[in-house]
Amino acid sequence: MEGQAVTTNPWLIMAINMTVVFAVLIALGILMEIVHLIDPTKKKKEAPAATAPVATPTATPVAPANASAQNEDEVVAAIVGAIVAMGYSSEQIASIRPTATSAKWRLEGRLSGRG
């Protein structure tokens, strides 16, 4: 093998190997960015709809017919408000349900006639 220059320096071999590895990683990163830019499955951005400011109605003290229903509406409104604050729209919320039903919730449902 007199025609080929062979090195036995481990530092040079390490530098060449690491250069190849990082060059491939950079190439993969660029390829991922290109695919991200031309992704045909990505939803198109819709123009933001101009929303008119909603006038807040004045609060009128009315005795609720069912305190449980009002409490449930307030809880749902608080959950929807928290989700909307995180960046989701109210149209994206499919349902609100507890992750695990406890004995207290089951009893509440039976006593209020929903179970």
UniProtKB/Swiss-Prot annotation:
| Low complexity composition-biased segments | 48-65
- Tell me its EC number(s), please: 7.2.4.3
Which InterPro entries has this protein been placed in?
Na_pump_deCOase
- The main enzyme category here is translocase
Where is region (Disordered) located? 46-70
Q: Where are the transmembrane segments?
A: 11-31
Query: From the UniProt record, which GO molecular function terms apply?
Result: sodium ion transmembrane transporter activity
* Main subcellular location: membrane
One Pfam family name is OAD_gamma
Query: Localized where?
Result: Cell membrane
Quaternary structure and interacting proteins, as annotated: The methylmalonyl-CoA decarboxylase is composed of five subunits: the carboxyltransferase alpha subunit (MmdA), the tunnel beta subunit (MmdB), the biotin-containing gamma subunit (MmdC), and the delta (MmdD) and epsilon (MmdE) subunits.
The UniProt function text for this chain reads:
Subunit of the sodium ion pump methylmalonyl-CoA decarboxylase, which converts the chemical energy of a decarboxylation reaction into an electrochemical gradient of Na(+) ions across the cytoplasmic membrane, thereby creating a sodium ion motive force that is used for ATP synthesis. The delta subunit is required for catalytic activity as well as for the proper assembly of the individual subunits to an enzyme complex. Can also convert malonyl-CoA into acetyl-CoA.
Protein name, entry field: Methylmalonyl-CoA decarboxylase subunit delta
Q: Which lineage ranks, top first, belong to the organism behind this chain? A: Bacteria, Bacillati, Bacillota, Negativicutes, Veillonellales
